Amino acid sequence: MSEPSSCFVLPDPEWIYRVGIGQDSHRFLPSDNPKPCVLGGIIFENTPGFEANSDGDVVFHAICNAFSSVTHQVILGALADELLKAKGISDSAVYLKEAVASLKPTQKISHLAITIEGQRPKLLPKISAMREKIAEILRISLDSVNITATSGEGLTSMGQGHGVQCFCVLTVMEFCPR
């Protein structure tokens, strides 16, 4: 018995869509800790960094998790831990580049939607820079990366200022010939 195809049987060669969902959250370090706050590859001054072995970039981590749900390749908790332990690499941009490399040659990123929850830092002044950095790493157009932000209105620990949480939805097109 042959293994079932991961592609739908279509009358002509077609693209199918795969959707990955990612989430990550980290608590802030005490304000006297010198570790910088990094979100979407951008440093936010006057905000403490995150409790994490890496730089704690919850945006890049959520995107990595979304890639994992599309490619079935575990980036965080496996590859990232190996890079950190073996080479001392704590830059989440490196982990995200590995996630991008996990795509098959037949797969192409179509769109990335990100929502970030936290009372601080104020994201609006740096959302454009975050979008540019993400688009650069993912090698997609700027209009394919969208970021929204919410304070959480104090309803969650993130909205109360204890940390930052990020959710994202990654849409990947895959060419599946008949």
Curated annotation (Swiss-Prot):
GO terms for molecular function: 2-C-methyl-D-erythritol 2,4-cyclodiphosphate synthase activity; metal ion binding. The keyword Protein biosynthesis does not apply. SUPFAM superfamilies: IpsF-like. Its EC number is 4.6.1.12. The record marks N53, S151 as: Transition state stabilizer. Keywords: Isoprene biosynthesis, Lyase, Metal-binding. GO terms for biological process: isopentenyl diphosphate biosynthetic process, methylerythritol 4-phosphate pathway; terpenoid biosynthetic process. InterPro entries: MECDP_synthase, MECDP_synthase_CS, MECDP_synthase_sf. Its cofactor is a divalent metal cation. Binds 1 divalent metal cation per subunit. 4-CDP-2-C-methyl-D-erythritol 2-phosphate binds at D24, S25, H26, T150, S151, G152, E153. A divalent metal cation binds at D24, H26, H61. Pathway: Isoprenoid biosynthesis; isopentenyl diphosphate biosynthesis via DXP pathway; isopentenyl diphosphate from 1-deoxy-D-xylulose 5-phosphate: step 4/6. The keyword Metal-binding applies. It comes from the Bacteria. CDD domains: MECDP_synthase. It catalyses: 4-CDP-2-C-methyl-D-erythritol 2-phosphate = 2-C-methyl-D-erythritol 2,4-cyclic diphosphate + CMP. Homotrimer. Involved in the biosynthesis of isopentenyl diphosphate (IPP) and dimethylallyl diphosphate (DMAPP), two major building blocks of isoprenoid compounds. Catalyzes the conversion of 4-diphosphocytidyl-2-C-methyl-D-erythritol 2-phosphate (CDP-ME2P) to 2-C-methyl-D-erythritol 2,4-cyclodiphosphate (ME-CPP) with a corresponding release of cytidine 5-monophosphate (CMP). PANTHER family: 2-C-METHYL-D-ERYTHRITOL 2,4-CYCLODIPHOSPHATE SYNTHASE, CHLOROPLASTIC. Belongs to the IspF family. This is 2-C-methyl-D-erythritol 2,4-cyclodiphosphate synthase.
